[in-house]
Every structure is written in C-alpha cells, then in structure tokens.
Amino acid sequence: MLKRSKFETTQSQIMHRAEDLISAASNRYRITVQVANRAKRRRYEEFESAEDSMMKPVLRAIIEMSDELTQPEIIGEI
C-alpha cells in the first residue's frame, strides 16, 4: 500500500525543485551548503519556538530556496 504524503508537495516535486536549484547554481557544493545551513537555522528556530512542524527542515529549505529562485518578488528589497 502506498504511503500518502501529508504535504501538498510530492517527492518528485521536491526532487525537481532540488535539481532546479543545483542547475541554477554556479557551484553545486555551495548551494548544498546553503540549503544545509538554512535547514539548520530553521530547525533551531522551530526548536526555540516549540513549534511542531510536520515538514523536515531540509525539505522546507529546498522549497523556500526554489521559491526564491522562481519567484524573486517574494524577496523584499533591502
């Protein structure tokens, strides 16, 4: 029996987003480290706020970073 995902993003969509991130990056190692650092930051933020997130931090980081890549308008002008 197939296990259904609780999220609206499927595993194939996550893989596609990760491939898009890697192909858009000039350095695969650097983008991997950036995703890992963001996931680590999110994990500590969730831990401090006692928020029980259903999505793993790495998956959330991949989704956020790919959204920033495809939708630059969500990143505010600093």
UniProtKB/Swiss-Prot annotation:
GO terms for biological process, alphabetical: DNA-templated transcription
Decide whether keyword Transferase is in the record: yes
Q: Which UniProt keywords are given for this protein, alphabetically ordered?
A: DNA-directed RNA polymerase, Nucleotidyltransferase, Transcription, Transferase
Q: What EC class is this?
A: transferase
| Example GO molecular function | DNA-directed RNA polymerase activity
> Which Enzyme Commission number(s) are listed?
2.7.7.6
Tagged with keyword Nucleotidyltransferase: yes
Question: Which InterPro entries does the UniProt record give?
Answer: DNA-dir_RNA_pol_omega, Pol_omega/Rpo6/RPB6, RPB6/omega-like_sf
SUPFAM superfamilies the record matches? RPB6/omega subunit-like (SSF63562)
Reaction catalysed? RNA(n) + a ribonucleoside 5'-triphosphate = RNA(n+1) + diphosphate
Q: Highest taxon of the source?
A: Bacteria
Any one Gene Ontology cellular component term annotated for this protein: DNA-directed RNA polymerase complex
Quaternary structure and interacting proteins, as annotated = In cyanobacteria the RNAP catalytic core is composed of 2 alpha, 1 beta, 1 beta', 1 gamma and 1 omega subunit. When a sigma factor is associated with the core the holoenzyme is formed, which can initiate transcription.
Q: Which HAMAP family match?
A: RNApol_bact_RpoZ
Say which family it is in.
Answer: Belongs to the RNA polymerase subunit omega family.
- Give a short account of what the protein does: Promotes RNA polymerase assembly. Latches the N- and C-terminal regions of the beta' subunit thereby facilitating its interaction with the beta and alpha subunits.
Q: What is this protein called?
A: DNA-directed RNA polymerase subunit omega
- Look up and give the organism this protein is from: Trichormus variabilis (strain ATCC 29413 / PCC 7937) (Anabaena variabilis)
